[in-house]
Amino acid sequence: MVATKFTLKYSSNIGFATDQGGRGFQLPAHIAVRSDNRIFVASRGRGPTVGVQMVSRDFEFFGKIGSQGKATGQMIEPSAIAFDSVENLYVADEKLNRITRFDYEGEVIDSWGEAGSEPGQFDHPTGLLIRDEIVFVVDALNNRIQKYTTSGDFIDQWGGQGSSRDSLKYPWGITGAANGDIFVADWGNDRVIRFTEDGQFVSDIHKGQGAELPLNRPADVAVDQDDNLFVADWGNQVLQVFDENGNFLDMKRGEADLNPWALQYFESQQDEKRARSSYVPVFETNTDDVREVSARIEPFFWDPCSVALDENGSVYVLETCRHRFQIFDRV
């Protein structure tokens, strides 16, 4: 197969901070796009913002799944979301250490998991991948990947804390290639590792050939049909793109403008609108601190924590601290 050449062009962004519920997010942790291109965002924060918000890239808000709490179907810190072959939604909660399965309409089917370090237990599950009715769970603080049936029966695990080629240190995101291989964002080791679906090491990327920056605390990874990798590089506050051989292709820092939700908010808050229009960033700290720069330059990514692709290959980058995601289309 000949890989299709592309560049990424900024399209739009969706979201703004809210603690009132309804449209908007608070400290979102993960993003996924269903086959019909409906966008699902795991929103945390507190109270009415906790759950999985559903939106379209046309700024439609469809409501949310789940609510704050510990009962079945509720959430405290939803950390990862994924879909199976019949579009059931799976939600990992790193506070409750469990996985909950919802049907297409958002009704609870079942949940499973508990805190611990034994097989079948979790310590902060942060990533989900579902393939051929197998659920792969990134068990972050146990430094391992676990495999389950869709009903929650334990199958296998691999990993273990360390920096060797087949070890993990606080892994975060996960995705799958077309040939069955699996990519894991190995946050603590500043790399993305490629495994077979049985956990055998294939390769890794620390710094792609031609890249300006080595990976620094990668939070999540997505892969397209040509095995190009899209990495939410949390430590560098960028999106990095590599080909299947680890060659650097592109890097994005963020280009967001005010989206319609934010514009509508400012129309009702004229004092804030005037203050924003006259704001000039002042750096009183070391500007080599990329997070400090991100915090003060609104178009930039501020803590990019998750990345997803839709059926057309568009790229969605979720930012925890700006409570939004930016969309880039291929051209």
Locations of regions flagged by a protein language model:
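Eukaryotic scaffold repeat domains enriched in small/polar residues
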Residues: 1-331
